[in-house]
A protein has these predicted regions:
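Long C-terminal interaction/binding lobes of large macromolecular proteins
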Residues: 1-252
Length: 252
């Protein structure tokens, strides 16, 4: 006699980079084992790979996880975590209110701040992907040339981090991998897929410092997973607006 089958609930969500709703299910014991194995190794690459594998499993193989922009992957992971474990995550935040003057400080290490650790409850289903108003992926670098960028994926970032230790080389590699096309004033379009990685890196290396700063504006204003709340310190009563931004902010 066969054992009964447990019905797993299904949900849908909308990602910025995909027009159709994405189906997903909570992760199960077999996926939890993947996380635990990666956690035991302590290797960030293993942890990242485990997240990607679990997301692939829980979206029924219907979307290309490796092609998702990093912010969409983070949002999907947070929503999946909310349905699988608990919709509420508790994050500790240290109060930054200055409660002691310079004369009142006890020693040179005393910052004068309250410093009390406060638990903050974050409902994962209230997290949003925020796109800054000024954000654009079309960057004119001069009067004659415009670059169209595509968002970095987690897979790309992992490959770059694995191979590059030098900051300048890292920047060049990331920028070159995120170019989608280069457009000239006369309308000529050079698709990045038609160029070699070496050609794209050489193109980045010919940019001036001012042009690189324009390009970096694309990355500095990229969409992020965000949660806004009001912080109230249980120790000193200080209040301030507080924003959690990026995957790391949602976990201690």
């Amino acid at each position: 006699m066969s054992l009964p089958q447990i019905v797993t609930p299904e949900y849908t969500l909308q990602l910025n980079s995909i027009k159709e709703p994405v189906r997903y299910r909570p992760y199960l014991v077999r996926e939890e084992k993947i996380f635990l194995t990666a956690k035991e190794s302590g290797d960030p690459k293993d942890i990242e790979s485990s997240i990607r594998q679990v997301l692939k499993n829980c979206t029924f193989g219907e979307i290309d996880i490796d092609a998702l922009p990093s912010f969409d992957m983070e949002y999907l992971f947070l929503q999946l975590r909310g349905k699988s474990v608990n919709n509420i995550v508790t994050v500790k935040y240290q109060c930054q209110n200055k409660v002691r003057t310079e004369d009142e400080r006890t020693d040179e290490n005393d910052t004068g701040r309250c410093g009390a650790l406060n638990p903050i409850s974050v409902p994962l289903d209230e997290i949003k992907v925020v796109v800054p108003d000024e954000h654009t992926n079309i960057i004119p670098i001069n009067d004659d040339i415009t670059i169209e960028f595509q968002y970095p994926t987690i897979a790309v970032m992992q490959q770059v981090l694995t191979g590059k230790k030098d900051t300048v080389a890292f920047t060049t590699e990331v920028l070159s991998r995120c170019i989608k096309s280069i457009v000239e004033k006369d309308g000529t379009v050079h698709e990045a897929r038609d160029s070699t990685p070496e050609e794209l890196r050489e193109f980045i290396d010919t940019l001036s410092i001012q042009q690189i700063e324009r390009v970096q504006a694309f990355f500095n204003t990229m969409p992020t997973v965000t949660y806004d709340t009001t912080f109230a310190c249980s120790e000193c009563g200080y209040t301030e607006p507080l924003r959690f931004e990026g995957l790391q902010d949602f976990f201690d």
